[in-house]
Amino acid sequence: MTDRISGPALAVIVPVYKHSVLLGEAITSALNQETDFEICIVIVNDGCPLPETHQTCLDFVSGAPGRVHYIRRQNGGLSAARNTGVEHVLNTWETVRAIYFLDADNRILPGALQRAYEALEESPEIGWVYPNIDMFGQEWNGDFSGEYSVLRHLEENICEAGSLVRRVVFAAGARFDESMKLGFEDWDFWLTAVELGFRGRHLDNFGLRYRKRPESMVRDSDRDRLEITSYIQRKHKPLFEFDSLHALEHREAPRYGIFKSNTGCVGLTSDPNVEGRRLGLEDFFDEYYRAKSAPMRYSRPAFVIVTQTALLDCLRQFRLSQWIFWYLETLVELSGVVHLAVRNDAGPHRIEVKTICDPADTTSREPAGLVIVKTELLDRYLDSGSANGIMSLAADMTRPTARLVELALPDDRDLPSLAPADATLHMLLQRMQDCRSRLYQGTSWNWRENSFRIKGELFKITRDMLNTGPVCPRSRQNGKRQIGFLLPLADFGGVEKTAYNLARVLKARGWSTHLFVFSSQSCRPVDQIVDAFDSLNFLCDPEVGKWDPNQRFMGSHYPNWVSSGQHQRALGLLAGLDAVVNCHCADAHALMAPLRRRDVTTVASLQVTDLSALDRPSGQTYLTLGYEYTYDHIACCSQQLFDWCHAIGIPEGKLALVLNGPSYPLPAGTAEAIVRTRLARRPGPLRVMSLGRLDRQKGLDRLVATIMLTRRAALPIDWRVIGDTVIDGTVPPELEQLRVEIEPAKLTQDELTECYGWADVVLILSRWEGLPLTIVEAMRVGVVVCATTVGAVAEAVSHEETGFLLPSAGTAAIAAAAARLLQRLCQDRRVLNRVSLAAAHAMKDWTWETTAGDFLARLEQLVRE
């Protein structure tokens, strides 16, 4: 029972327009309420042109003086009428604690408001109480039961306007939108209340009777639904963004149930890096079967994962956990069940992913440490009572699908000892079959209908709202801005090293950084990637990277994927980012427009214009020009490239100059120490190093010719050739003839520092370049650079002052010029030492923090805006 107060505790607002006859039923049902508190009724005539409406209102005022109040206003629409009533109630009765909205063609049962008011008083944390919908006329009984879900409310209007709303909701500023003339203004009102921090509560047997006709205002609203929902989503934009949707999913209907065999508990979460609710097995079984019996009312995870804490920790260590869950989710939706096996045989500093789709090839050298099962398949297995194992049901899937993912980690890393996940899954299934909860799994006592999405699939709302495939379970941590770097492959080239270093600097500035590898399913060097990024992700789309000979822009080919790829799937992987940097990933151009529509800041990082076999300019600079409209910024690695982009049509305000820096930072004092050590070395053979890929671009033929000339001249030179061989893995025959040992690419900072500490000269004879990072990091420690004048090399090297530039020419001419220069340096170490010291001095403050600082400040401002 409620305490007696002086004055009405509850107000009923009845807006009316052209329902002069039905109005009588509505007001009578409000007057007949059986309550232990006082009720006042406010009729708002919204400028109805029918005289009968006005007379009916007057009749009720005279028939129930003090209880029925009448306001007549100019026509403004349903929202305006309700707001007029709200203002009148708030200004007239301080005693009113709640307001109920009753449409003039509906009615309520005698005990409705007593029950609703008591529910409101029992739950001080809620803002309103809402009913089921029981229709008459066209009969239908709608089930809106279960715990209130904001996530579901974003997809469907689950709260009828005929709800009881606490006064404080209006005091906080919630009102009906008077510009909404097409309907669903109540949906908009509830979302406003949600934004103000209020939540609803469903009340069974509320007592609302809703009149339904074949044609009505509600029917018109359904026809205009797309226009209305678009307006609502724009107005309440923060609610419909990824961060909000994902956080709501995690709280209300987490998609993953992770059973860790070492703890015996199930964690319910939508992000493997975020702790969710923890349940013991019996409690989990109860919730599982309860949701199986009443899927509209209760939630259960859509995917059950069996693993151990040690494996999840291992995945987090390599920044792979969120991506692995996303990738397994994309596979298990087709397969029903997928295994993950982890090995440590990828080679040094390397990670590699292999997906096995052949049902006959589902065995791994390592037992699976994780199994993910779709709940739908679990149900089929539990209902069948099959003794053949869950894989026998998965084999019935009609499409050829993946069964096993193998993750190979660096071979110098220890793996945790893991129990086979298959055995744990079998135990879990046996326990579920034996569980007493199964006694009520098939029984549903609900006679009402529900056309909404079942609660266990609310996680799909995020996909639909964002128009993507499965979304990566990546939560925003501590409010950090999130940026993704998109690469075709993640190796140790200049494009990749630029991305790694920009990410490192942004991470130090408080960003959360993420690496996305589109074309390759491997990456290196692991340590640098782990240091620079908070997550590592592979698109794993076999159609990426296939070039279309018929699709060109200014002579450069585009990949097939830009016009026919699985863009929604990729956008799901990228969901939740504030900014993306496309680092020469041609396929990713297709994603920039939809990302910008989601207010993601888009940046293209350009490094170099390639040359074709016929020395025709082509490549990423031209491809990016074709998509220039979709980018907010285009970052150029040199002034030369900046000027070219501007000259070819890109507005100067969109361009940013980000000069390349060294590929890795050095501890304070290290560069100076290396320079001192080199100067103090005893005279000996000139130490000349070639560091980079052994291919046409890097001038392999020029290098070979130079070595041959220096050997013929018997110059005192010690050579080191360091880099990857050609694609097929064989040693170039020219170098074989010279008997030059090729050292593998140096992937760690210590290895690179040793190389630079050893060398006097680094020789770079490229056919084309941007601004090579090797030049900057060599000069930083006093290594004298001898390089061809291509690209923007001259922006870092001043000829005869901080290095030496060789004019671009044919192979023979360049080799001859390089050999003459090396002979000069062999003979005059004073020149070598002078240039060495000048180079080190010139690079003293040339760091990524300084070269990228202005651009990153602009990027941060753009993201804030």
Residue ranges and their predicted role:
Residues A64, L536-N537, G729-D750:
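Nucleotide-activated donor-binding/catalytic signature segment of Leloir-type glycosyltransferases, i.e.
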